[in-house]
Amino acid sequence: MKLTFLGANHEVTGSCTLLEAAGQRFLIDCGMEQGKDVYENQPIPVAPGEIDGVLATHAHIDHTGLLPLLVRNGFRGRIYATKPTAELCSIMLRDSAHIQEFEAEWKNRKGQRSGAEPVEPMYTIQDAEAAIALFRGFDYNKEVELAPGLVIRFVDVGHLLGSSSIEIWVTENGATTKLVFSGDIGNLHQPIIKDPTYLKDADYVFMESTYGDRCHGPKPDYVGELAKILQRTFDRGGNVVIPSFAVGRTQELLYFIREIKEKNLVTGHGCFPVYIDSPLAIEATRIFKDTDPSCFDEEANALLAKGIDPIQFPGLKVSVTSDESRAINTDPVPKVIISASGMCEAGRIRHHLKHNLWRKECTILFVGYQAVSTLGRSLLEGATNVKLFGESIEAVSYTHLRAHET
C-alpha cells in the first residue's frame, strides 16, 4: 500500500490523494486550487488512464473541480460518492466548466489586441458532462466493494449536503488495514444537515486541519449577529452584499434569514427583499428542497413536519438572467444580495462588489473561508482599492460574520 499526497498538503484548497493498494489506483478527491497560491498542486504521478477510480468526499470544487480535466486527459474509471454529492456535482462541474470557457474567451479577446497567443480553457462543458456520467451514488453507511481487497463506506460528516468521511478497508497478504479520510468536517449544530458522525476505530486517519491551529469558542449567535448587521446597514440606507458559496453556505443563510424574519428581528424595513443572484445557488437550493429528509437534522425535519420550508420565506427573490441580475443594482430599496463566487474570484458577485464596495452605507459580509491570493482574502486583509472589470474601486464597506468562516 502506498499513499501520495498531491494537494492540500500545504494549502487549504486543491485536495487530492493517490492511494495504491490491493492492485488498484484510486484518487481520494480531485480538487481545484482556489486563488493563485505560491505553491502549485503536484502532477499526478500516474497517467489518468491508469487510475481505476475516484472517491469524492463532497461536492465543493476544491475537492472535485479537476475531475473534468482528469477525464479530458484519459481517465475512464468510476467516480464514487454519496447520492447527494453526485447530484450536486452534476450542477457544480457544469458551472465550473462554464467559468473556464468564459475566462478563456475573455483572455483571448483581451490578448488579441496585444498579439498574445490564444489560450484554451482548462476544460469544457463537454469534459464536465463526461465526468458527470462517471459518477456512481451510494447511501451513507453502506459497504461497497471496489475490488477484491478494497472496501469503502461513506459516513456523514456534517460539512455539506452529502459530505462524507470515507472509511477504506485494504486487505493485502491476508492482513486488513483500515484507513479513514476525514474530508472536510462540519461544525456541531450546523443548520439543516446532521452533525458529524464519530468514527470509533482506524489504523490510519488522514484529517483536514483548516482550523487545526486554533480552539473554537462557544457556538456564536449567528442569527442575532446577522440581524444586527442587517439592521445597521438598512438603517443607513445600504445593501448587505454577501459573497457566498452557492452550495451549503447559501442555504444556511436562507435558514438564518427565515428565522430573522419569523422573529421580526429586523424592524422598520418591512418585508425586506433577499436576492439569490446565482443560477448555481438557485439550482443547489432546488436540490436541497428535493433531497430525502433523512439527510437533514431534527430541527429541519421538525419544520418540515409542520409544513414549513426551512429555506423559504416572504421577500425571497431569485435572479436567473443577466438582465434580472443587473436590475438588482437599480433598485434603491435596502436589500440582501447573496451571490457567488464565495471568494469573489468569478461570477456575478464581482458586479455587485463594483456597485456596492465603495458605498459607505453598504456592507460586504464575508461568511466563508477566503483562500490566499483571492479577492475576498485581499479585502479581509485590509485592501483599500481593488480592480474590478478594469476599474479601480475603493473598498470601504466590508466585514465578516464572526466565527462563521469554516
Indicate residue ranges for each PLM-predicted region.
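Short gly/pro/ser/thr-enriched loop/turn and capping motifs at secondary-structure boundaries
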Residues: 86-88, 213, 281-283, 371-374
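A short helix-to-beta-strand connector/capping loop
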Residues: 127-134, 147-150, 270, 313-316, ...
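His/Asp/Glu-rich metal-coordinating catalytic cores
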Residues: 1-55, 64, 71-252, 258-267
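Conserved small/polar residues in nucleotide/adenosyl-binding loops
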Residues: 399-406
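Acidic, Ser/Thr-rich peripheral helices and adjacent loops at domain boundaries
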Residues: 101-104, 287-308, 375-395
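Hydrophobic beta-strand segments of well-ordered beta-sheets in folded domains
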Residues: 52-54, 78-79, 205, 273-274, ...
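Hard-cation-handling environments
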Residues: 229-238, 244-372
